[in-house]
Amino acid sequence: GTFYLYFKDKYELQDVLLAKTSHEFFANACKKANQHHFDRLDDKIVFIIDSIINELIDRPNILKFIQKNLSLGLYSEKLTDLLDSEELGIKELFIREVKEKDIPLEYPEMTLFMIIELVSSTVFTSIVEKQPLPIDEFKPHLYKTIRLLINEKEL
């Protein structure tokens, strides 16, 4: 009945819930990061990602629901229409700090997207299946790769 007044089918509802949940993870992690001082953008992004990973570890039901769809909370047009947030999200934070710190990234938004997709696709498998490594052993390798993506011009 009334379900179809808001969503065309159950998949649209699922996408909206996924995007909203993912958005909340990023919003909470960004709030935590804003309570600290970071000289480097890569340190701040790794802190945010680590916060999200730890929350996913602590909430296995949410992890199974989100699976590998972490970026939906950042790149979902449906969610943008539903949320009216005054706070800077990770996307805005990342782009602003790239400019402020004069980090020579040619496409900052694409770099952030690649970071989120990398995290999303690898962390689920590492937490749930412990492949290729258990998450605590995997994190240092992941964070090194994130730093390389952000500091690409320093290579």
Regions found by a protein language model. Name each.
Residues 30-34, 66-75:
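Short linear capping/connector segments at secondary-structure termini
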Residues 1-12, 16:
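Helix-turn-helix
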Residues 98-145:
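Hydrophobic/aromatic-rich alpha-helical bundle segments in the mid-to-C-terminal region
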Residues 23, 27-30, 43, 55, ...:
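Amphipathic alpha-helical packing segments from all-alpha helical-bundle domains
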Residues 10, 17, 21-25, 48, ...:
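Hydrophobic/aromatic residues within well-ordered alpha-helical segments
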Residues 15, 19, 38, 42, ...:
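Short, structured helix-loop boundary elements
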Residues 150-155:
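Generic C-terminal helix-cap and adjacent flexible tail
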Residues 16, 20, 30-58, 115:
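Hydrophobic alpha-helical connector segments
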